[in-house]
């Protein structure tokens, strides 16, 4: 392990090569583990970036919570695919855990009707049969997303239930399952999802919109290499159509995280 110096103990840092996140306190006191040595003398290079927008967002959210009387709140982080939702949501969760607040991070990617590969096939089928207007009427709607299922999760959380059934979706056929999850002691539910600002989603107390552009999301999707067709013309057009809808849904946001990292009210 190598310990770092001069960091902010309460801040969250992103290690750029691995994508892992660490608190400043952990890096200074416990350190970062080194990979196994393959030869006698070996050099390693790490690059850490402070996720400043996460700290700023945390402060804004805490100010909002001070005026909120609910014991349990749902905060959604929504934006384009590859806009940084997962990175920001994970860092925000760490801030809550650091101050002793029970916080659960839920991914909306578990709630389409079909696994990603089959959903892409359905998107293509809709496009071939009904054109771009048909595709626009499919993306992010109840035809693509099981909004009833995720709305039930948010309703159960608000009702104070300590055990809630969550859905888990893999990337291959048959990889869809349900699991009872313990929510006792959880007062903040973070939902990170492209469709977290949809009018069909009910139960969100504070929607947070992440600004992005199709060009940026394309670059990030390719870089993270989650899907083989991330750079295909069809998927790029899907991302553009989703971005059109997101620009309409930004009106639902209580807070906006700008491309420059600034956090502001609309």
Where are these regions (language model features)?
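Carbohydrate-binding surface patches
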Residues: 1-9
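C-terminal beta-strand-rich structural cap/linker in extracellular carbohydrate-active enzymes
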Residues: 25-52
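Extreme N-terminal, non-catalytic leader segments
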Residues: 51-76
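Conserved lysine of the Walker
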Residues: 85
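ATP-dependent NMP and nucleoside kinases share a basic, alpha-helical "lid"
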Residues: 175-224
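Small-molecule kinase domains that catalyze NTP-dependent phosphoryl transfer to phosphate-bearing small molecules
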Residues: 226-266
């Amino acid at each position: 392990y190598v310990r770092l110096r001069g960091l902010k103990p309460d801040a969250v840092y992103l290690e750029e090569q691995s994508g892992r996140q660490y608190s400043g306190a952990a890096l200074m006191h416990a350190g970062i583990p080194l990979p196994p040595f393959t030869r006698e003398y070996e050099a390693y290079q790490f690059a850490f970036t402070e996720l400043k927008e996460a700290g700023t967002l945390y402060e804004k959210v805490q100010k909002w919570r001070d005026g909120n009387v609910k014991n349990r709140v749902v905060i959604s982080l929504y934006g384009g695919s590859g806009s940084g939702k997962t990175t920001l949501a994970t860092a925000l969760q760490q801030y809550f855990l650091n101050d002793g607040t029970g916080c659960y991070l839920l991914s909306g990617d578990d709630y389409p009707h079909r696994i990603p590969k089959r959903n892409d096939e359905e998107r293509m089928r809709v496009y071939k049969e009904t054109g771009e207007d048909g595709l626009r009427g499919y993306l992010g709607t109840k035809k693509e997303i099981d909004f009833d299922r995720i709305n039930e999760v948010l309703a159960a959380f608000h009702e104070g239930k300590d055990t809630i059934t969550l859905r888990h979706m893999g990337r291959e056929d048959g990889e869809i399952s349900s699991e009872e999850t313990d929510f006792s002691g959880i007062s903040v539910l973070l939902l990170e999802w492209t469709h977290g600002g949809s009018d069909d989603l009910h139960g969100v107390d504070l929607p947070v919109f992440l600004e992005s552009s199709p060009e940026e999301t394309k670059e990030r999707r390719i870089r993270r290499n989650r899907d083989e067709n991330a750079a295909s013309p069809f998927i790029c057009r899907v991302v553009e159509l989703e971005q059109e809808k997101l620009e309409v849904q930004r009106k639902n946001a209580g807070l906006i995280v700008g491309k420059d990292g600034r956090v502001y009210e609309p």
